[in-house]
Amino acid sequence: MNWTELSIIINHEAVELATNILENHGSNGVVIEDSDDLINQPEDKYGEIYALKKEDYPDKGVRLKAYFNELTYDDKLRQRIKDELLNLDELDQHNVQFSEKIIAETDWENEWKNYFHPFRASKKFTIVPSWETYAKEADEELCIELDPGMAFGTGDHPTTSMCLKAIETYVLPQHSVIDVGTGSGILSIASHLIGVKRIKALDIDEMAVSVAKENFRRNHCETLIEAVPGNLLKDETEKFDIVIANILAHIIDEMIEDAYNTLNEGGYFITSGIIKEKYEGIQSHMERVGFKIISEQHDNGWVCLVGQKVSE
């Protein structure tokens, strides 16, 4: 299977909405190359900074690179994405450029490696590519070694970062965790590093399960995390203290009742993948089912909610 890299150069004001459009239409990751970074090169909020190459950035504006597999990226989807982007009020119509290139499946992982470096994803967690060597900066730093494979992001998406922050806050070593839509397995690995002994990772995609298992092996927890194909929580009979789901909003909406029923009393539902336009509906649904919303994070147009199962 081949992949299409859709490259779009746009003005800064349109970046957030354009990124949401690409992700909502199924892009397996969006790379953001901002020309301002060459000028400012600021130290990020966790103290990481890397040397930037001028040739990797547009002369002005921002280049977005989105990745679609050949099974889903057809002429209809191409035109739909273009129409939605061109209809953005924030878009400067005179300074927008579209281009595409095909990336063979065998080159996909190497393409990602050009953009994937160690980075601090939250206060405690640092994501480290499996092909790089990294020395911890502090004893309390928890490193997740990750190889995203061909169809999964690198862990730098706001929804992942927010979930990691929620795990830091609410997950304790004595808890049990079920990770729904595990993808690369990053949130299961984070739970393991917190000290959780009972973890189950589900994904409807068997390739995701395979990628997750390989990442569990890299992090020396392959025998400690149960990774299995599963259709959300529809067939789940066991109870857990924590349900984690970093998936799309409409899928979260389908599983809220099942998440509530899967949790032990007092347990937490940590969920993200929710765009800001849909989070109020998700929050209302969670509250109707019986969740008490105890945390709400916002980052770059995305929302992470934490609901606790409590008795009336």
From Swiss-Prot:
Compartments in which it is found: Cytoplasm
Leader sequence residues: none
Chief localisation class: cytoplasm
GO biological process: methylation
Keywords from the UniProt entry: Cytoplasm, Methyltransferase, S-adenosyl-L-methionine, Transferase
Keyword Magnesium recorded: no
GO molecular function: protein-lysine N-methyltransferase activity
Known EC number: 2.1.1.-
Catalytic activity: L-lysyl-[protein] + 3 S-adenosyl-L-methionine = N(6),N(6),N(6)-trimethyl-L-lysyl-[protein] + 3 S-adenosyl-L-homocysteine + 3 H(+)
Protein residues bound to S-adenosyl-L-methionine: 160, 181, 203, 246
Highest taxon listed in the record's lineage: Bacteria
Family: Belongs to the methyltransferase superfamily. PrmA family.
PANTHER family (alphabetical): ELECTRON TRANSFER FLAVOPROTEIN BETA SUBUNIT LYSINE METHYLTRANSFERASE
Name this polypeptide is given: Ribosomal protein L11 methyltransferase
Source organism of the structure: Staphylococcus aureus (strain bovine RF122 / ET3-1)
GN (gene name): prmA
